[in-house]
Design a protein with these regions (language model features):
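Short linear capping/connector segments at secondary-structure termini
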Residues: 86-94, 124-130
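Conserved beta-strand positions that form and line the central face of beta-propeller blades
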Residues: 22, 34, 86, 97, ...
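N-terminal alpha-helical segment of soluble enzymes
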Residues: 10, 26-91
């Protein structure tokens, strides 16, 4: 049975607990892989890695970030059939739905943000001729999100 690993600091690694959970195919009720039962130690390692990467990431240009997002979208499209099969098996949905909605949406979302970042702007507002208020949109650090959403990416 396939064993899924955590991806932390550019490496696929076992959870620190060495504990895995069966991943069940909802269409038949049978386990088809094992997923990490990650704990606080794994989260802390991921955050530590993200903070270390931030010093590099914050220096990338908008164009470089856009290019990275587009490369991710390219990778999704290049692996379309494999991702459709994985999404269908993971969620028990028809292959046709994963192929028509889920996987195209994942690459489309990345391409949307790849374009949006190039058109981001800052605002400037004059205050009664005595001051100027302005906003700058720049990376400020590591953020985490646990999204209760069942579409990929």
């Amino acid at each position: 049975m396939e064993k899924i690993l955590n991806y932390i600091n550019g490496e696929l690694i076992e959870p620190s607990s060495k504990i895995y959970i069966e991943n069940i195919d909802p269409s038949c009720g049978k386990a088809y892989s094992l997923v990490p039962d990650s704990c606080a130690d794994d989260v802390n390692e991921a955050v530590k890695s993200a903070k270390a990467a931030y010093s590099f990431w914050r220096k990338t240009t908008k164009q470089e970030r856009s290019d990275i997002l587009n490369k991710l979208a390219d990778a999704i499209e290049e692996n379309f059939d494999m991702l459709v099969a994985a999404e269908s098996r993971d969620n028990g949905k028809p292959l046709s739905l994963a192929a028509k909605v889920d996987i195209p949406r994942a690459s489309a979302n990345l391409r949307f943000f790849a374009g949006a970042i190039l058109h981001d702007s800052s605002d400037v507002h004059e205050m009664d001729g005595e001051a100027i208020n302005y906003t700058l949109r720049v990376p400020i650090g590591v953020a985490a999100c646990i999204s209760p959403w069942n579409l990929p990416l």
